[in-house]
Swiss-Prot record:
Lineage: Eukaryota, Metazoa, Chordata, Craniata, Vertebrata
Name of the protein described by the UniProt record: Capping protein-inhibiting regulator of actin dynamics
Organism: Mus musculus (Mouse)
Cellular localisation: Cytoplasm, Cytosol
InterPro entries assigned: Actin_dynamics_regulator, DUF4592
Keyword Membrane annotated: no
Amino acid sequence: MGARAFSHDSIFIPDGGAESEQTVQAMSQDNILGKVKTLQRQLGKNIKFGQRPSNAIPMKKAGSTDASSEEDFVLTSPMEIVTQQDIVPSDTENKSSDTPSSSSPLNLPEAGSDMEEKVAPVKPSRPKRHLSSAGTIESVNLDAIPLAIARLDNSAARHKLAVKPKNQRVSRKHRWLAQDRQNEPGSFESQSSLDQNGQLGEDKHIWHGEEPEPLESHEEKRLHEEYWRELEAKCKRQKAEAAEKRRQEEQRRQALERRLWEESLRQELLEEEEEGEEEEEVKEEGEEGEEVGLQPRAGKVPPEEGHQSGPEEQRCTEQELGGADDPARLEAEERRREQEEAERQAEKLRQREAERQEEEQKQREAERQEEEARQCEAERQAEKLRQREAERQEEEARQREAERQAEKLRQREAERQEEELRQREEAERQEKLRQRDAESQEEELRQREAERQRAQEEDAKGMLQEEEEEAKRIEELKGKETPEPLVEEGPQSPEGESQPWLTDDADQRSPLQRDLEKPGEREREDLESAGQREIAEEPRGEGEPAEQSGDLDAHCGGVDGEGKETAQTDSPQPQERQMEGTPAPEENEATAADIDRKVEELRWQEVDERQTMPRPYTFQVSSGSRQILFPKVNLSPVTPAKDASLAPAAQEPPAPRGAASHALPSALSIPHTAILVTGAQLCGPAVNLSQIKDTACKSLLGLSEEKRPMDVPTVESRAGSGKSRPAPESPSNAAALAEWASIRSRILKNSEGDQRGDREPARAGDEPVPRARCDSRGNVRRTPPVNAKFSIMPAWQKFSDSGAETFRQSLDGESGRKKPGLAPSEETAPQPHAAAQQEVSQEPPDTTDGCKFAKDLPSFLVPGLPSPQKAASRTESTTTLDSETTSDVGNPDPAMPGGEEKASPFGIKLRRTNYSLRFHCDQQAEQKKKKRHSSTGDSVGGATPATGSVSGESEPEATFLKHGPSLPQERKPALSPRKDSAESHSSGHYVAVAQSGLPPASGQTPAPEQDRAVSKMPSMQKPALAPKPASQTPPSSPLSKLSRPHLVELLARRAGKLDSEPSETAKESSDNQPPSPSLPEELKGQKRDEKDVPEKKPASPPLPAGQQERPSLIPETGRKEKPVLQSRHSLDGSKVTEKVETAQPLWITLALQKQKGFREQQATREERKQAREAKQAEKLSKETVSVSLQPGSSRASKTAPVHKPAAPSEEKKPETAVSRLQRREQLKKSNTLPTSVTVEISDSAPSAALVKDVTKRFSTPDAAPVSTEPAWLALAKRKAKAWSDCPQIIK
């Protein structure tokens, strides 16, 4: 309203009417083109504005506002909007000069053709509609305009009133037909004029209310009429032109409609859906058209009424205009409606088509995407399929490959199994062949033994007289040297043993046979031999080193002249046998004792057979508790050897020895496979005995006639071990023992290196070591064989017995004999001891050779040459009671395999390396064995003291040495000995009784076992002899030898006596019988003993001290070597002891505590044992006197040491008790030690220290343990450090 009312066209200043008109026209002409402009210019000169009917403006306002508002709400399609635009600009053409593009008529002619493209002008039109709809005077901003309004001229108002009706009609037509007339120039003139008039009308209306319209003059009316006429003429022309244009436009529209209808036909479906909407739109548009038509009609009336001056003219003009306009307008409206409808439909079609196309495009896009997705999915699926196929093929290929591999493996496995079967079959065939060979050899041996026995019987008859004489001498000697007879007995066996082995075995077996046949004769013979040994050993005790060397040399020579020695030994033994036969009372006693012993041996043999049934032993080789080197090592005892040996042993004592040796041949291998130093390998059968050609080896192994002597020599070697006593045996016996030692050492060496080439030199070199070893070994061997189920041996000794295969065979011969009974074990020990002692005196350095340290497993010592092994064992045993113990233990271990150890494999445990061999045996059997050994130790200990009352001190000392050196062995027995107050005695007794008891169990072997036990007893008595050796350490080794053979005889007799006398020995021997079943426990006991050995070894070292005094020459060298061994092999008792004690403070403390109790027990037990031993010692001393007389110089040398040891033996007895206590402590330690812990052998170092303490111990046996404890405690502490370092070292 404001925009129209106050547009420049409608404002006139009254003073300058024409000027204002011109100004207004000029302003409006900017937007007016063509004819309209010219018409306005022309009219502007003539038109005088006068008042128009006031109704015109309201009608106009109402029409324009209502129409615009209706159109705002009703118009929906683009065509309608365009129409609205065309209409509104026609009304507001002059007013909206600001928007020429929308209001300018120039744009309108193109609306028909470009209908679709003129949607944009809607926006300018709507603001105009808004203004028009809002048009009220109040809403107009009149701040600056009221002055102009006040100055408006009447002519302008009149002109407006005059022009308004037509203007309104034209504008209404234009509203209806704007689209039809868009391109018609005539319409623009009418529009512009109508707009002007309309605006003027509006303006006039405004001031019409303000002031009354003055009446126009006549002239003005005339001019006005002229103006209207001209205007009408112009309008007609314009209408004609517009009609023409409309026709043209209508044609175009029809063509467009045809096209649109054609499109609509194509989209009938869409049209049908939207017909309802279209019809509604058509109705709405019809209504709009009607309303629009009403508005022009309504607008007509007021102007007609408004004409006051010229109604007729106006009517004419209106009629003309109406006549001209109505048909055209109606046509135009009809065409417009049709066109609009067509356009709307075409637009809808286009929209629908566009939507359809867009939808189709979307669908196509979606389909394309879906197709792509499907393709991708298909590709993925195909890829997956390909992958799965490839995987399947690969899997099939893998399966095929796996099947091929499995097939290959199966084939290889089948081939391997076939190969194994073939190998097993071959091995079985070979084993059968070996067994047949062994059986044939055993048969030969049995025949030879029978011949020997017959010869021995003849000799015995001849010897009865000599024995009677010797019995007298023995009786005289008994009071002086009880241990000497023991030693002599041992020597006799060793003598016969070492001489021709056959002769020695014959001698020993003849004593055993005599025991079986003529116990009295045998006893006399044993007494004579013992007496001779004692006599020879006493001198030896003083000049032991030289005597030993001589003996060793003699033995070497004896080895060379084995037959000679055999003859010599045979002759002395027959004499002894005659002497034995002479003393009827003693012979009767011996016979009774032999009978009892045989009975018990049979029992023991049965027990041993049961226990030694080939029970495979499994043990672990472990480094510490964490690293297990070999989780399960199986040691399977050789049943044939054991059975053969046990069966023959059961048959007769002499035969048993032969049987034992035979059993070994039948076994063709060591009773138990030996663990090599590597620990990884298990030795198979040492050698086929049938393959042994060397007579010495055969004699050692009992493969030849000497095999029987071998068995006896084993005992005799023990007798030799106590060479001081073997002196009574006579040089022949000494030579035989030396020969034995050299042969054995050589065998060991040969098995290690030049088995036979080195024998002679080895003999010579090793014999000194053997003496030293024998001391320790004799001691160690004595005890451990009984208990040792599992013996810890120096590698050299172990291998000397079991490590060196040749020596092992010899040991096997021995241990074969020993297998029948524990005595064989001890036999093995004594022989090595005898040989070792001789070798020690002769060749201490060989000890070093004997112990070769395995580099791969430092815990195991590789056996050196046989002699070096013995020498090493000697040296180690002498130098280190520990190593001695180890060696002894080693021998006993093999011996035990022979006897009790049949059930128990022998292994080496070295504390330093922390490698342990765990032997798993029946706990019950072990416990039984332990009980036996403990009881046996007591009875044997008692017997030993009784026998060694004279040699009691030396015997306890020797026993201590035994316990020290043989602590490994004694550790086992010593365990019981510890329990037994007198440990050395208990160990000695234990060994002796166990052996004597076991000999009964083993029947024939029992005799050798008894001899061995006797030899062990002499070893215990050997301390008695050892006292001299204490001054001379080597003598103690002879003492151990003498005491062993002597103890063997003593135990043989004592076994009878113990069986007859105190049944305690029998009980103990029966206990020993259990020990064989309880070998595992014995081994445990032995381990304990061995563990205690460090403690006891200090005590035993005093004996070594005594021994060292004698063997000091050799033992010192041996000791020097022993320390090397200790450092090298950690076998040295000192280092081992250190390790044991230091490594295990707990067990050390426990061992110390146990030592106290054991010392007390030992004191009481030793008292009892000494009482028993005193009696036996008297008998043995008498026998020893006679025997020592017979043995000749060699026996004299042996006997001299024996006699000397007799006194020291008493001293040593207290020390033996001390040593027993110490040993027990060590055994306790060993007991406290973990079973898997490597058992230390710790005598050698303590022996050196003990040498210093020996005098103290001798003087104060009870105090000796105290002095010993510090030494071994220090060693133990050092060992503890070593132990702590062991795992790292091992790694």
